[in-house]
Swiss-Prot record:
CDD domains: Complex1_LYR_LYRM7. InterPro entries: Complex1_LYR_LYRM7 (IPR045298), MZM1/LYRM7 (IPR050435). Residues 102-115 have a biased composition (Basic residues). Assembly factor required for Rieske Fe-S protein RIP1 incorporation into the cytochrome b-c1 (CIII) complex. Functions as a chaperone, binding to this subunit within the mitochondrial matrix and stabilizing it prior to its translocation and insertion into the late CIII dimeric intermediate within the mitochondrial inner membrane. Modulates the mitochondrial matrix zinc pool. This is Mitochondrial zinc maintenance protein 1, mitochondrial. Keywords: Chaperone, Mitochondrion, Transit peptide. The keyword Mitochondrion applies. One of its GO terms (cellular component) is mitochondrial matrix. GO terms for molecular function: protein folding chaperone. It is found in: Mitochondrion matrix. It comes from Candida glabrata (strain ATCC 2001 / BCRC 20586 / JCM 3761 / NBRC 0622 / NRRL Y-65 / CBS 138) (Yeast). The keyword Cell cycle does not apply. Its main location: mitochondrion. Belongs to the complex I LYR family. MZM1 subfamily.
């Protein structure tokens, strides 16, 4: 039997997951229903190799990922372009980390014949 406190945490995580799917898959009912069915299946038949706390943490991480990092696109008819559905919760990076030089230098290329 799962303690009441963990049951409440699991229910809260499940609700967060449902909300995240609504945000991430808004307007795409097929994917929304599939994601929710998968989430429900995970709640009804949890992975026995993980503790309840680990499962709750995983569900919270999935919900956060869906809400902040998943962007859906829809092809614009007659064009080779897509309209991205970016909402207020999406993390928008500034690409500053890409501009920073790496601290590792590339090794010189060595041929087999150099032996």
């Amino acid at each position: 039997m799962i303690p009441e406190a963990l049951r409440k945490q699991a229910l809260i995580a499940y609700k967060h997951g449902l909300r995240a799917t609504r945000v991430a898959f808004d307007g795409d009912n097929r994917v929304l229903l599939a994601a929710r069915a998968e989430m429900r299946k995970g709640m009804e038949n949890p992975d026995s190799s993980k503790t309840t706390q680990e499962q709750i943490q995983h569900l919270e991480e999935v919900a956060t990922f869906l809400k902040r990092n998943l962007v859906q696109g829809q092809k614009i008819e007659g064009e080779e372009k897509y309209h991205l559905k970016i909402h207020k919760d999406i993390e928008l990076g500034d690409n500053e980390s890409i501009k920073q030089p790496t601290k590792f230098k590339a090794r010189p290329f060595k041929k087999c014949s150099d032996n």
